[in-house]
Amino acid sequence: PHGIANALVLLHVLRYNAAEVPAKMGTFPQYQYPHTLARYAEIGRSVGLTGKNDSEVFEKLLQKLQELMDTIEIKHTIKEYGVDEKYFLETLDEMTEQAFNDQCTGANPRYPLMSELKEIYLKAYYGEGNIPESGKAKEKKEEK
């Protein structure tokens, strides 16, 4: 279902968007400076989270979101839902292209490169920091 798919990529997308030095896209001059981290911290503070700085509040927000997902029994990875790895990797390029071309992508606070979208999908499938070397090598090869 759509909601579970959103939950599986949510934390990865939030972390991606919160980067303090994103690649600036010339076609989007309205993004004068990155302020997404501050906005996410504002959300965290509005629900009672505190911290020494925006980064700390943001990390606590991610923790709370993960706790919520655990409470409602959302698994941590796409793989845990039984999606076949071979099938996932065979369809990864198509999914990446569809995400890049989605009408909502242009409204994202950080305009992604296709390689970055692919990385988000890989993290959502394997889990943060668990992408096998074969997945990384394939990505690097395709970027050239």
Say what each PLM segment does.
Residues P1, I78, K136-E139:
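Proteins with a high burden of low-complexity, intrinsically disordered sequence enriched in S/T/G/P/A and R
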